[in-house]
Amino acid sequence: LGQGMKSVTRQIAAEALGVPIEDVYVDTADSDTGPHDMGSFASRGTHRMGNAVMRAAAEARAQMLEAAAEELEVNAGDLATDGRGNIHVKGAPSRSITVEETAQAAQFRQGRTLAGRGIFLVPMSDVDPETGEMTPVSCFAHAALVVDLTVDDETGEVEVTQINSAYEVGRALNPRLVEQQLIGGAWMGVSHALYAVSYTHLTLPTMLWV
């Protein structure tokens, strides 16, 4: 079912821009419409893509507030968003303009386009010349799993009866999606352990074959 990236990136963009999540549309780009990336392997989509979206939305928000400030004849720093698609003067909610009106004014009256770009890269870890150590990943999964199973003494068949998972996930932006990831990851582990091809049954050529 995937990592739910469209849902979580909509949440991030909506909160940053101060608009309802229903007003955010995520376009799944390909190499025709967007740059290349390395993918969101290992359930890292929220960490990587989420930070990029946050930066892009912050840049777009700054431009949006500048455009709204010009329309309301105030300083951009005096403006706030209400999360419902409105921009208003702090302390004076009646002096407001909608995000839609701001975008239209920016495009057709001010001659600017409201757009943000964001990129998130984790710095490469160099090997310490003295210790030989390095940081192989940017974040770790702090977790514990206990699996209850039964084994048939005669056939060796394994049956998993229960999986108990405990994770420290930090701040969950979407708890339902996190739960799905944990359940999916647990069953993926079971799949690897019980159903994937085992290298113990893989015949490799040796010197005896020569």
Predicted regions and their residues:
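Single conserved hydrophobic/aromatic residue that forms the stacking wall/gate
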Residues: 201-210
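Cofactor-binding beta-sheet edge motifs in enzyme active sites
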Residues: 1-202
